[in-house]
Amino acid sequence: VTDEARARVGLTAVAPPGHRWLGPLVNELGAATVWAALLSGEPPPGRPPPSEQAVRSWRGWSERARRVDPDRLLDASAEAGVRFVAPGDPEWPGRLDELPVCYGLWVRGMGDLRNLCLRSVSVVGARSATSYGLHVAAEFSCELADRSFSVVSGGAYGVDGAAHRAALTTGSTVVVLACGLDTDYPRGHAGLFADVARTGVLVSEWPVGRTPRTPDFLVRNRLIAALTPGTVVVEAGARSGALNTASHATDLHRVLMAVPGPVTSPMSVGCHRLLREGRASCVTRADDVVELVVPLGEAAPEGAGPLVPAAELDRETARVLSAVTRRGVGTAVVASNSTGNLEHTIRALGMLAAAGLVERCEAGWRLPERRRPKRDAHRARSAPG
């Protein structure tokens, strides 16, 4: 682990994600320099806190930093099945570079976060969703998963849960939490999160041991918006947290979409406002979403085959794909012929399955019937729009 990564681990434990003063300081000087300054108690030379509140914040962060051992935190996380992904790591999603700052991500699950987010959509909405909202969330998410999209949401009751469950029926999903990944919140979704971890991932900016706090959910929402090229708001009341996610999507220049609902439903007031103000595009089916988030010429018709170009896979995942045959091969053999690491291979296979590049069979894994090796790397460019 590099000093820079170790410092970022520490920062997740002592400072709030995306802080408007500390964040730019980390971007400018590097996490290792800022972490060393926190341990010393003195701000970096020439970079004094800009206000009395910032001075108090610095003192609090400095006191907490002296009580944090990044290496022990990494060990405790590994015991809980949680890994740390820093900017620049192979699993780091490139879209997060557009955030003003993100110290790093804690990740749990067999999926590969970067690969899952290559072709993805965020689906959000009310916790107290109506039957209409639950139906639409499930229908959209299932159809998006059928078309090789990963569904990203916040793991809450209501629309989030419906979206995650539907995506799992044919693909993978990403859960973004506002607490440490050793905590299942809400508790009623512990089983759902276990299912997600088998093929997808759970993600958080907070380390293990951190319990959920109300302000953290709004901070978490910016990550949901940032991970994907587009966000769909299925249902949202006048003060719904989903509208906060929508604002982040707009700020990040992502595609914002909203589903219209009954004019008499208070759970659709927020969606109708987004549409009335021209902030969101109206979507009534998954095909509408695909047309808006996928560049012209890349939206292959349903059933045309894998929709993640092989050229966009990281090197390790590409090696795993090359070890899978048409007749089928066992997981251990794939690992032996590719990465040499069984855990990494299982994670890569889960991602490849979600992308439609491999499928399960009696022998283990095989290439789908429709796969055409010579065209994979060019499918996105040659598919009809």
Task: Please provide the spans of the model-predicted regions.
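Glycine-biased, small-residue-rich flexible motifs in mid-sequence functional cores and linkers
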Residues: 2-5, 16, 86-385
